[in-house]
Amino acid sequence: MSNSVTNFEMSSVLPGKKPCQGKNNESQVVQTTPIKKHSVTFKNQSSLGVIDHYARLTNKSHSSVIAEVVDLAIPILEKCNRHNWSINEIKNDLLKFSIKESINRSRGKTEVTLEEYCSLIWKTNIMSPLKIPIADYFQLNANDEFMGKDEKTVIRERLSSLRENYDMEKAIYIYNQRHFDVKHQSVSGYSNIILIHRTTFEGYYFDAGQALLLSTSQLIIFGINEVLRRKGIVMPYPVVCWIDIYHVNEMVVMLPVLRKTDVSNRVNVPDDIIINPYSQESRT
């Protein structure tokens, strides 16, 4: 099998109208068929050979043969479209079963805590497997305690571009290290970017926009609810559980999970989130 690539252009007919002159030089409007071209790439040389052979037998052009093949495949594609919802439901059911079985095997028990369940959902169905480490250098309006406006703008533009390129819902930028050079008035550091390709699964909503950076030791000593109470943090909706999604600088990024029915109560935040554990502002 050859790996060569061959390109063809196909034309599709679209309805339209254009003016023309009648027999008495009167202006008329007639129906036309504007042409829309599509480029087709063949990576499989054997497929191209079959099309070429069929074109010679039927005395047709390559584009006509390809168009004929596409027309034959349309009913199949239409049927796939009709059943696409059912296919996705089956995939979700299989994923739910896989998640529960994975937890049961790891714990050796049938009981599964909601935190365990949601944590595994996060790892398998919410967070993208793409890992994007970044080394940054900003010679911008920034300082040691607070991130400058230009620094935030550059990061958000990068996150927005990544979300668009990879078709993601949200993106989280987390500094692993951040150093401020007083002499050169510059910031350098290392970070990771977490991409989120969906925010809901099985009736749960994973609210990355309300993720909190909390002390690891305080969470161990007091637990999440007491830490929130001591900090005076009140969530705008009932949280069913909290899951840890990242550990950095002796701190933990905790993400709230709520029921999908309570999503209307959440606070709207940007899709691009920046978390900086090395300044007085933990997130922006």
UniProtKB/Swiss-Prot annotation:
Entry superkingdom: Bacteria
Extent of Polar residues compositional bias: 1-10
InterPro entries reported for this sequence: UCP007319 (IPR016513)
Stretches the record annotates as Disordered: 1-28
Protein name: Uncharacterized protein YagM
UniProt source species: Escherichia coli (strain K12)
Gene: yagM
